[in-house]
């Protein structure tokens, strides 16, 4: 076992939510319109991008996952804006002496098209995390009609973060 503290930490996050009629579709703090009026089901606003980034941040520091801090059994978090949750997570990260070096995320969805909203999502995340938007990469892809995303049963997101000790 080493006693040397690392200068960098990497975290990986993943989230998926089911698409349901009657729910809002919010990704990266942006309200999108699904052609079939579908939205993401979840206890909070079910923002898969924000959730995967939170899990990556928490994972990088071995702090568990978002369910530990914002359990679905707690009504306080019902329908909450996930950017609020993300701001709480980044406060925790900074209290431990870490800063974001960069974030890279990929959203997996057949519809709606995500690309037209990427810059707005980056601005929302930049403002919430208090980092330059050049530190944030967001990509979108389809699943070529394979799996739950391909069958439009859900939307998922994978995120990787690099933290640097300050």
UniProtKB/Swiss-Prot annotation:
Pathway as given in its UniProt record: Isoprenoid biosynthesis; isopentenyl diphosphate biosynthesis via DXP pathway; isopentenyl diphosphate from 1-deoxy-D-xylulose 5-phosphate: step 4/6
Gene3D superfamilies attached to this UniProt entry: 2-C-methyl-D-erythritol 2,4-cyclodiphosphate synthase
GO BP of this protein: isopentenyl diphosphate biosynthetic process, methylerythritol 4-phosphate pathway; terpenoid biosynthetic process
UniProt keyword Manganese, yes or no: no
Cofactor: a divalent metal cation
GO MF: 2-C-methyl-D-erythritol 2,4-cyclodiphosphate synthase activity; metal ion binding
Catalytic reactions on record: 4-CDP-2-C-methyl-D-erythritol 2-phosphate = 2-C-methyl-D-erythritol 2,4-cyclic diphosphate + CMP
EC number: 4.6.1.12
Annotated binding of a divalent metal cation, by residue: 15, 17, 51
SUPFAM superfamilies linked to this entry: IpsF-like
Top-level division of the source organism's lineage: Bacteria
Site label Transition state stabilizer, positions: 43, 142
Residue runs in coiled coils: none
Subunit structure comment from the entry: Homotrimer.
Family according to the record: Belongs to the IspF family.
NCBIfam families to which the protein is assigned, alphabetical: ispF (TIGR00151)
Function, as annotated: Involved in the biosynthesis of isopentenyl diphosphate (IPP) and dimethylallyl diphosphate (DMAPP), two major building blocks of isoprenoid compounds. Catalyzes the conversion of 4-diphosphocytidyl-2-C-methyl-D-erythritol 2-phosphate (CDP-ME2P) to 2-C-methyl-D-erythritol 2,4-cyclodiphosphate (ME-CPP) with a corresponding release of cytidine 5-monophosphate (CMP).
The protein's name: 2-C-methyl-D-erythritol 2,4-cyclodiphosphate synthase
Organism (species): Prochlorococcus marinus (strain MIT 9215)
